[in-house]
Amino acid sequence: MDNFLPFPSSNANSVQELSMDPNNNRSHFTTVPTYDHHQAQPHHFLPPFSYPVEQMAAVMNPQPVYLSECYPQIPVTQTGSEFGSLVGNPCLWQERGGFLDPRMTKMARINRKNAMMRSRNNSSPNSSPSELVDSKRQLMMLNLKNNVQISDKKDSYQQSTFDNKKLRVLCEKELKNSDVGSLGRIVLPKRDAEANLPKLSDKEGIVVQMRDVFSMQSWSFKYKFWSNNKSRMYVLENTGEFVKQNGAEIGDFLTIYEDESKNLYFAMNGNSGKQNEGRENESRERNHYEEAMLDYIPRDEEEASIAMLIGNLNDHYPIPNDLMDLTTDLQHHQATSSSMPPEDHAYVGSSDDQVSFNDFEWW
């Protein structure tokens, strides 16, 4: 046993390798080149190992194992390049007490990782089950809301003209004293005007055509807005003749419609048209709110005339109670009085001087 070496002598240039077939026949041998005995590892690094330390060293530094005639073995390396014929049949390799091919185990790990990634993408692991339920619920509510809006839009065209054109209500206004007066303009509810009527880019406004719902007659109005402290009031101008011909009175309702082609229509309803009490109250509340915000608009012709007159006077004439103006006029009067001739001379002042003097007799 002392002279035993598990590899052939130094003169041997080849070694017989056992080749296994699927039927476990060991009758076939192949010859492969081998190393010189000077290049071979000592026998205590080859199996069987004498001590666990030597076995661990062999695992950390794997070397090819060669067969002897007495103990035929299969050469094994970590890469498995010398026994490629056995890679395709790992079960046979396990039966012999060997290890699996590292390449196959690596591919198996990669396949498992890919499968886990696919499952994570399908189940969205970043979201909890409650979040998934909430997202699905929100999506369902959004779809339901869109369907309701579409159905409401279709159902909003409930009225029609005599030529069967579908109409929907854009704006409704209960006429006030200022709307049917001689000012020739009708104030529209701000909320309805901004939401439904054409958009206005400047104060000049646009010209709109409106057709009577009950006839073929059309009217042309100037649709514009007035600004006041970051707020707006929307009006229809050039309505004087329109009010007269339609016999509009205080308390009547002007309703503006729109057809499916975005054409505008109107209808003038008298006091008998107040059948829907809810709509009437809502319209009154809106009108009261608009008039309260923009209180500077006159309510009748007399107030409008007075406001216009006061504005013109303030722009072109000084305020009578201004002390600076009174002081200036008094100095001018004193200067003209000191330059007048004595009483024994007959001097007739100009009409301007007389007026200026009379103005300050009370001073």
UniProtKB/Swiss-Prot annotation:
Pfam families assigned? B3 (PF02362)
| Phenotype caused by lack of the gene | Pigmented seeds. Distorted seedlings with elongated hypocotyl and curled cotyledons. Presence of trichomes and accumulation of anthocyanins on cotyledons. Unusual pattern of storage product accumulation in seedlings.
Q: Which CDD domains match?
A: B3_DNA
Location within or outside the cell? Nucleus
Chain residue ranges for the region called Disordered: 1-27, 331-351
The GO molecular function terms of this record are: DNA binding; DNA-binding transcription factor activity
Biased-composition ranges for Polar residues?
Answer: 8-27
* PANTHER family linked to this entry: B3 DOMAIN-CONTAINING TRANSCRIPTION FACTOR ABI3, B3 DOMAIN-CONTAINING TRANSCRIPTION FACTOR LEC2
| Name of protein | B3 domain-containing transcription factor LEC2
Annotated source species: Arabidopsis thaliana
Per UniProt, what is the name of the gene that codes for the protein in this document?
LEC2
